[in-house]
């Protein structure tokens, strides 16, 4: 692997000896010790067998030199959990042998060591077990091979204070017997029974398995406080790339006067914050598309439909229907009885829409507008009752009830208001007497919902539609003060 000219990389991932295919399951490979598998880092492991001794030594040596466990995991191609477990075990017991935490290598505590432990605890009652263990090593009372584990020291402290000598002796004897039983069934004991140890492994098991390397105990690090200049530098780099490589991180660390580890952690936290913000923005955009997703208080006020002063001429209606871009689409109205019962009245409404109720369908429907009449028009299109503003805007207080006169209205997408027209259509006045004969019909016959096709509520041409005759039934329902 070649590097850039003039740059000396700190950490280079070794190139694998062979390119393994990236599959969902680990690839099986043949090793001298048996059938192995390849982990996600490219390292070979044998399921059920502990990590080889030389790799355990390498892990402890790298940790002794201050290399982080995540870097050790990538360089040695060992899983992060395995590295952390070996280092934690070595810190607690001083051993890198497999199964040392479970008591597979029992260390019988001598009376002299127990007396020292009691003395340390008596002099300093707040001393922890791991501090007592470190003091035993520091004072030379024990070495790495004979020092008791942290759990053994804790058991000694629990048993020595408040119990008699006979109970102590019996407890020690029971612990020793249990330790011997556990040793036979430990991983190390089972592997020794299965495979005869070679002379090299026997030598290395007692000498090489215990590297006398002190590890720094992990201290809780205080949170890093970034200055404004450092944050500006980091944000500029984050705008360029969310995943900087090792060279970019080191260069950025030099410019911002930070360590490469701090830069790496900052980018990790910044990516998490960016993903959270992106998800929240997507959710907000999606909820704006669905008005019912949030209560009305969380949604902006929807603009109400307004009416213009200019009315459509009867001759222009067939052209508007034939031209899809100019077609006025009306949603299908609801029956008067159910709507009237479900909607509250609002006498202070200044503008409203009327749904002309024709006994002959849309053949007698008129495009006209209704002037405001105070308390007589209680419907407000802005009432949030579960219906869309378009449907509510087309409903009246007495929708469909006879003997309610109304004037012509025009529906236009242009901004305007509800004002009385200057003149009434001549066709309405000509057919007024003709419509008076229909007063005897019932209210249920007055509701005639229109038919719409499935493609965007476009009106279907029917035989009953006579566009030049629009306005023949409007004047019958006009109020006396308007007529």
From Swiss-Prot:
Q: Where is this region: RED subdomain?
A: 112-160
State the conditions that upregulate or repress this gene.
By wnt-signaling from the posterior mesoderm.
Q: Does the keyword Calcium apply?
A: no
Predominant place of localization: nucleus
Compositional bias (Acidic residues) spans? 200-211
Q: Which SMART domains match?
A: HOX, PAX
Listed Polar residues bias regions: 310-329, 338-352
Instruction: Give the tissue specificity.
Output: Expressed in the dorsolateral ectoderm during early and mid-gastrula stages. At late-gastrula and neurula stages, expressed in the lateral neural plate, becoming progressively refined to the neural folds during convergence and extension. Expression is also restricted in the A/P axis, extending into the midbrain but excluded from the forebrain.
Q: Where is this region: Disordered?
A: 164-227, 310-353
Q: Which GO terms describe its cellular component?
A: nucleus
Which keywords does this Swiss-Prot/TrEMBL entry list? Developmental protein, Differentiation, DNA-binding, Homeobox, Neurogenesis, Nucleus, Paired box, Transcription, Transcription regulation, Wnt signaling pathway
Key word Transcription present: yes
Briefly state the protein's biological role: Probable transcription factor. Promotes both hatching gland and neural crest cell fates, two of the cell populations that arise from the neural plate border. Acts downstream of msx1 to induce the neural crest, cooperating with zic1 and mediating signals from both the wnt and fgf8 signaling pathways. Induction of hatching gland cell fate is independent of zic1.
Q: Describe the family membership recorded for this protein in Swiss-Prot or TrEMBL.
A: Belongs to the paired homeobox family.
The protein's name in its UniProt record: Paired box protein Pax-3-B
- Which species? Xenopus laevis (African clawed frog)
- Gene encoding this polypeptide? pax3-b
């Amino acid at each position: 692997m070649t590097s850039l000219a003039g740059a000396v990389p700190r950490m280079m991932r070794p190139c694998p000896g062979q390119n393994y295919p990236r599959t969902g399951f680990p690839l099986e490979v043949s090793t001298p010790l048996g059938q192995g598998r390849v982990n996600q880092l490219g390292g070979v492991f044998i399921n059920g067998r502990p990590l080889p001794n030389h790799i355990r030594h390498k892990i402890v040596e790298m940790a002794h030199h201050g290399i982080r466990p995540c870097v050790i995991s990538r360089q040695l191609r060992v899983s992060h959990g395995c590295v952390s477990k070996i280092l934690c075990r070595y810190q607690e017991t001083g051993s890198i042998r497999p199964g040392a935490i479970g008591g597979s290598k029992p260390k019988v505590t001598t009376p002299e060591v127990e007396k020292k432990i009691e003395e340390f605890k008596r002099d300093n009652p707040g001393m922890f077990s791991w501090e007592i263990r470190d003091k035993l090593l520091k004072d030379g009372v024990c070495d790495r091979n004979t020092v008791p584990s942290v759990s053994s020291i804790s058991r000694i402290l629990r048993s020595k204070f408040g119990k008699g000598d006979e109970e102590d002796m019996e407890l020690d004897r029971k612990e020793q017997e249990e330790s011997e039983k556990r040793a036979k069934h430990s991983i190390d004991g089972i592997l020794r029974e299965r495979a005869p140890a070679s002379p090299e492994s026997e030598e290395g098991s007692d000498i090489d398995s215990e590297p006398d390397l002190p590890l720094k105990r992990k201290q809780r690090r205080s949170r890093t406080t970034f200055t404004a200049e450092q944050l500006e530098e980091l944000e500029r780099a984050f705008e360029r790339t969310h995943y900087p490589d090792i060279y970019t991180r080191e260069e950025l660390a030099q410019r911002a006067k930070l360590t490469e580890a701090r830069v790496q952690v900052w980018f990790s936290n910044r990516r998490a914050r960016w993903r959270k913000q992106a998800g929240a923005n997507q959710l907000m955009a999606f909820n704006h598309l669905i008005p019912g997703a949030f209560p009305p208080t969380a949604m902006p006020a929807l603009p109400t439909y307004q009416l213009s002063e200019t009315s459509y001429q009867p001759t222009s209606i067939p052209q508007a229907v034939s031209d899809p871009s100019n077609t006025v689409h009306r949603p299908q109205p609801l029956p008067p009885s159910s709507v009237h019962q479900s909607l509250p009245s609002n006498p202070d409404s200044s503008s409203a829409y009327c749904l002309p109720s024709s006994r002959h369908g849309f053949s007698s429907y008129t495009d006209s507008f209704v002037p405001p009449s105070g308390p007589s028009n209680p419907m407000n299109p802005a009432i949030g009752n579960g219906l869309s503003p378009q449907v509510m805007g087309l409903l009246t207080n007495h929708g469909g009830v006879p003997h309610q006169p109304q004037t012509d209205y025009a529906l236009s997408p242009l901004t305007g208001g509800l004002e009385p027209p200057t003149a009434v259509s001549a066709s309405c006045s000509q057919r007024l007497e003709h419509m008076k004969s229909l007063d005897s019909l019932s209210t249920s016959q007055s509701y005639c919902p229109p038919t719409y096709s499935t493609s965007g509520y476009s009106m279907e041409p029917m035989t009953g539609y006579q566009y030049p005759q629009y306005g023949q039934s409007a004047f019958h329902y006009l109020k006396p003060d308007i007529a």
